[in-house]
Protein backbone atom coordinates (compact mmCIF):
# COMPACT_ATOMS: atom_id res chain seq x y z
CA UNK A 1 0.00 0.00 0.00
CA UNK A 2 1.32 3.45 -0.89
CA UNK A 3 2.78 5.54 1.95
CA UNK A 4 0.14 8.29 1.82
CA UNK A 5 -2.68 5.73 1.87
CA UNK A 6 -1.12 4.19 4.97
CA UNK A 7 -0.60 7.63 6.52
CA UNK A 8 -4.24 8.41 5.82
CA UNK A 9 -5.26 5.43 7.90
CA UNK A 10 -2.78 6.20 10.69
CA UNK A 11 -3.95 9.79 11.04
CA UNK A 12 -7.63 9.19 10.39
CA UNK A 13 -7.51 11.75 7.59
CA UNK A 14 -8.82 11.23 4.08
CA UNK A 15 -6.42 11.65 1.19
CA UNK A 16 -7.53 11.85 -2.42
CA UNK A 17 -4.86 10.63 -4.79
CA UNK A 18 -4.74 12.38 -8.15
CA UNK A 19 -2.20 9.94 -9.45
CA UNK A 20 -1.19 10.19 -13.06
CA UNK A 21 0.96 7.05 -13.08
CA UNK A 22 4.06 9.17 -12.78
CA UNK A 23 3.03 11.37 -15.67
CA UNK A 24 1.89 14.38 -13.65
CA UNK A 25 4.69 16.83 -14.34
CA UNK A 26 3.31 20.11 -12.97
CA UNK A 27 1.38 20.94 -16.12
CA UNK A 28 -0.94 23.96 -15.89
CA UNK A 29 -3.92 21.62 -16.26
CA UNK A 30 -2.85 19.66 -13.17
CA UNK A 31 -2.57 22.90 -11.21
CA UNK A 32 -6.09 23.86 -12.33
CA UNK A 33 -7.54 20.55 -11.13
CA UNK A 34 -5.90 20.98 -7.71
CA UNK A 35 -6.85 24.65 -7.59
CA UNK A 36 -10.52 23.76 -8.03
CA UNK A 37 -10.55 21.19 -5.21
CA UNK A 38 -12.07 21.94 -1.86
CA UNK A 39 -9.39 20.65 0.47
CA UNK A 40 -7.81 21.09 3.86
CA UNK A 41 -4.27 20.55 2.57
CA UNK A 42 -2.38 19.43 -0.53
CA UNK A 43 0.53 16.99 -0.61
CA UNK A 44 2.41 16.97 -3.91
CA UNK A 45 4.75 14.30 -5.12
CA UNK A 46 5.15 15.76 -8.58
CA UNK A 47 8.84 15.49 -9.37
CA UNK A 48 9.30 11.77 -9.99
CA UNK A 49 9.36 11.71 -13.79
CA UNK A 50 10.18 15.32 -14.49
CA UNK A 51 13.45 16.55 -15.91
CA UNK A 52 15.54 19.32 -14.37
CA UNK A 53 14.44 21.60 -17.21
CA UNK A 54 10.75 20.86 -16.59
CA UNK A 55 11.14 21.64 -12.90
CA UNK A 56 12.97 24.87 -13.74
CA UNK A 57 10.27 25.94 -16.19
CA UNK A 58 7.11 24.82 -14.38
CA UNK A 59 7.40 24.74 -10.62
CA UNK A 60 7.03 28.49 -9.94
CA UNK A 61 3.76 28.81 -11.87
CA UNK A 62 2.47 25.53 -10.44
CA UNK A 63 3.08 26.58 -6.84
CA UNK A 64 1.81 30.11 -7.46
CA UNK A 65 -1.46 28.75 -8.85
CA UNK A 66 -1.99 26.49 -5.84
CA UNK A 67 -1.17 29.25 -3.35
CA UNK A 68 -3.51 31.66 -5.12
CA UNK A 69 -6.39 29.17 -4.87
CA UNK A 70 -5.56 27.89 -1.39
CA UNK A 71 -3.88 30.80 0.44
CA UNK A 72 -4.58 29.43 3.91
CA UNK A 73 -4.06 25.73 3.23
CA UNK A 74 -0.87 23.73 3.73
CA UNK A 75 0.79 22.77 0.46
CA UNK A 76 3.45 20.15 1.09
CA UNK A 77 5.97 19.08 -1.54
CA UNK A 78 8.02 15.90 -1.42
CA UNK A 79 11.08 15.30 -3.63
CA UNK A 80 11.73 11.94 -5.30
CA UNK A 81 12.02 9.25 -2.65
CA UNK A 82 14.84 7.25 -4.10
CA UNK A 83 18.42 8.36 -4.30
CA UNK A 84 19.69 7.20 -7.65
CA UNK A 85 23.12 8.59 -6.86
CA UNK A 86 23.66 5.11 -5.50
CA UNK A 87 22.73 3.66 -8.87
CA UNK A 88 25.14 1.82 -11.08
CA UNK A 89 23.65 3.69 -14.05
CA UNK A 90 25.95 6.72 -14.29
CA UNK A 91 23.78 8.55 -16.84
CA UNK A 92 20.71 8.21 -14.64
CA UNK A 93 22.70 9.18 -11.57
CA UNK A 94 23.88 12.46 -13.12
CA UNK A 95 20.40 13.28 -14.41
CA UNK A 96 18.82 12.66 -11.00
CA UNK A 97 21.49 14.66 -9.16
CA UNK A 98 20.96 17.59 -11.53
CA UNK A 99 17.19 17.42 -11.07
CA UNK A 100 17.50 17.17 -7.27
CA UNK A 101 19.68 20.28 -7.22
CA UNK A 102 17.08 22.23 -9.20
CA UNK A 103 14.20 20.92 -7.06
CA UNK A 104 16.03 21.83 -3.85
CA UNK A 105 16.96 25.31 -5.05
CA UNK A 106 13.53 26.15 -6.42
CA UNK A 107 11.46 24.62 -3.62
CA UNK A 108 13.59 26.10 -0.85
CA UNK A 109 13.00 29.54 -2.35
CA UNK A 110 9.27 28.93 -2.79
CA UNK A 111 8.90 27.65 0.78
CA UNK A 112 10.53 30.87 1.99
CA UNK A 113 8.31 33.00 -0.24
CA UNK A 114 4.98 31.44 0.80
CA UNK A 115 4.14 30.80 4.45
CA UNK A 116 1.94 27.81 3.66
CA UNK A 117 4.32 25.99 1.28
CA UNK A 118 6.50 23.28 2.78
CA UNK A 119 9.36 21.39 1.16
CA UNK A 120 10.19 18.15 2.96
CA UNK A 121 13.67 17.59 1.65
CA UNK A 122 14.54 14.34 3.37
CA UNK A 123 17.71 12.76 2.06
CA UNK A 124 17.89 8.98 1.99
CA UNK A 125 14.19 8.52 2.79
CA UNK A 126 14.45 5.00 1.37
CA UNK A 127 17.91 4.35 2.74
CA UNK A 128 21.17 3.91 0.89
CA UNK A 129 21.32 0.15 0.60
CA UNK A 130 19.31 -0.30 -2.63
CA UNK A 131 17.08 -2.81 -0.81
CA UNK A 132 14.06 -0.49 -0.83
CA UNK A 133 13.43 -0.58 -4.55
CA UNK A 134 12.66 -3.15 -7.17
CA UNK A 135 14.52 -1.24 -9.88
CA UNK A 136 16.11 1.80 -8.19
CA UNK A 137 13.13 3.81 -9.37
CA UNK A 138 10.02 2.31 -7.76
CA UNK A 139 9.81 1.54 -4.03
CA UNK A 140 9.00 -1.96 -2.83
CA UNK A 141 7.30 -2.76 0.51
CA UNK A 142 10.46 -1.95 2.45
CA UNK A 143 10.77 1.32 0.54
CA UNK A 144 7.19 2.26 1.36
CA UNK A 145 7.83 1.49 5.04
CA UNK A 146 10.89 3.71 5.04
CA UNK A 147 9.08 6.52 3.21
CA UNK A 148 6.27 6.43 5.74
CA UNK A 149 8.72 6.53 8.65
CA UNK A 150 10.67 9.39 7.06
CA UNK A 151 7.83 11.62 5.92
CA UNK A 152 4.88 10.57 8.08
CA UNK A 153 5.82 12.39 11.30
CA UNK A 154 6.73 15.58 9.43
CA UNK A 155 3.48 15.60 7.47
CA UNK A 156 1.48 14.85 10.63
CA UNK A 157 3.19 17.74 12.46
CA UNK A 158 2.37 20.22 9.68
CA UNK A 159 -1.25 19.10 9.46
CA UNK A 160 -1.69 19.13 13.25
CA UNK A 161 -0.35 22.68 13.40
CA UNK A 162 -3.41 23.71 11.42
CA UNK A 163 -5.92 21.61 13.29
CA UNK A 164 -5.97 18.62 10.96
CA UNK A 165 -5.86 15.64 13.35
Language-model region placement:
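Histidine-centered active-site loop/cap adjacent to the catalytic His
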Residues: 134-165
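Proline-aspartate-enriched helix->loop->beta-strand connector
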Residues: 34-44, 71-72
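Acidic-and-aromatic substrate-binding clefts and catalytic sites of carbohydrate-active enzymes
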Residues: 21-27, 49-56
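The substrate-binding groove and active-site-proximal loops of carbohydrate-active enzymes
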Residues: 45-54, 90-98, 134-142
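Generic structural signal for well-ordered alpha-helices
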Residues: 59-64, 104-107
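Substrate-gating cap/lid alpha-helix
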Residues: 83-121, 146, 165
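Serine-esterase "nucleophile elbow" of acetyl-processing enzymes
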Residues: 1-20, 28-35
